[in-house]
C-alpha cells in the first residue's frame, strides 16, 4: 500500500483480497489503474499477486476480483509482474489457464521500462567475507581498493536526495536513460523510509560520488 501512495495521483490504487472459508486473508493483489489517452484505462500489479503462487484457487479468486475491477474502470488490460522464477512451469500453466498471456518476446534486458528478468543473490546466513568470496576477483579488488583510497558509505537523509538526484541526472545523460524528477524520489522517501527504503551514498574526500536506493520487500531487497 505504501508503494500505491508513491504512484498517486497519476495512478489510482485498488486492493483485491482472497479469503479462505474462515475469512482469513490468503492472498492479495494491489492494482494501479491509469488512463491512457486514446486507448482507455490500464491496470498494473507490480510484484503481484502476493500469495501461494501454486494455489490455483487463490489465483482464481484474485483474477475474478481483477475482472470485476476491470469492468468498474472499463480497463482494457491487466498486467501483472509476479515474483516468480522464469522457469516455474506450474505457475505458467496456471496463469495461462486463467487467461493470462505470458510475454516472452523481450530480446534484451532493456527492451522494456521494467526489465523482463531480475538477478538475485542469496546472502542468507552468509558473512560479509563469504559474500565477497562469491564475487569475481576483479570486483573484490575494486571494492577493497575503494576502501583503501578512503571511499566511505553513509546512510543519507531526505535532504541528501538532492545530491543523489544530481548524480542520477549526470549518469542518465551520459548513458542515455531517462531519470525521474527529484519530487518522485522525495515521495518515495516520504512513503517508504525507513522501513521499506534507505538512501546510501558513497563519499570520496567529502564529496558524494555515487548512491543507491535499496527497496525492501518481504525478505528481499531490490
Enumerate the language-model features and the residues they cover:
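Acyl-donor binding region in acyl/amide transferases
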Residues: 39-111, 218-222
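A conserved beta-strand-loop-helix scaffold within acyl/acetyltransferase catalytic domains
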Residues: 1-22, 26-39, 82-87, 98-222
Amino acid at each position: 500500500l505504501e508503494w500505491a501512495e508513491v504512484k498517486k495521483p497519476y495512478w489510482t490504487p485498488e486492493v483485491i483480497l482472497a479469503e479462505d472459508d474462515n475469512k482469513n486473508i490468503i492472498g492479495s493483489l494491489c492494482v494501479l489503474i491509469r488512463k491512457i489517452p486514446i486507448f482507455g484505462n490500464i491496470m498494473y500489479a507490480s510484484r503481484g499477486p502476493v500469495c501461494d503462487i501454486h494455489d490455483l484457487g487463490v489465483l482464481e479468486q484474485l483474477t475474478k476480483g481483477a475482472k470485476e475491477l476491470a469492468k468498474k474502470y472499463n480497463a482494457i488490460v491487466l498486467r501483472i509482474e509476479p515474483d516468480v522464477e522464469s522457469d516455474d512451469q506450474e505457475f505458467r500453466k496456471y496463469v495461462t489457464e486463467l487467461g493470462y498471456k505470458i510475454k516472452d518476446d523481450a530480446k534484451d534486458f532493456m527492451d522494456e521500462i521494467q526489465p523482463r528478468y531480475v538477478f538475485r543473490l542469496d546472502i542468507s546466513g552468509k558473512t560479509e567475507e563469504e559474500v565477497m568470496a562469491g564475487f569475481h576477483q576483479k570486483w573484490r579488488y575494486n571494492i577493497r581498493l575503494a576502501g583503501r583510497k578512503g571511499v566511505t558509505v553513509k546512510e543519507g537523509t531526505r535532504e541528501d536526495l538532492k545530491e543523489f538526484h544530481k548524480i542520477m541526472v549526470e549518469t542518465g545523460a551520459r548513458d542515455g536513460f531517462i531519470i525521474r524528477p527529484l519530487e518522485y524520489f522525495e515521495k518515495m522517501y516520504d512513503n517508504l523510509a525507513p522501513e521499506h527504503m534507505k538512501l546510501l551514498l558513497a563519499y570520496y574526500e567529502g564529496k558524494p560520488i555515487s548512491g543507491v536506493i535499496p527497496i525492501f520487500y518481504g525478505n528481499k531487497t531490490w
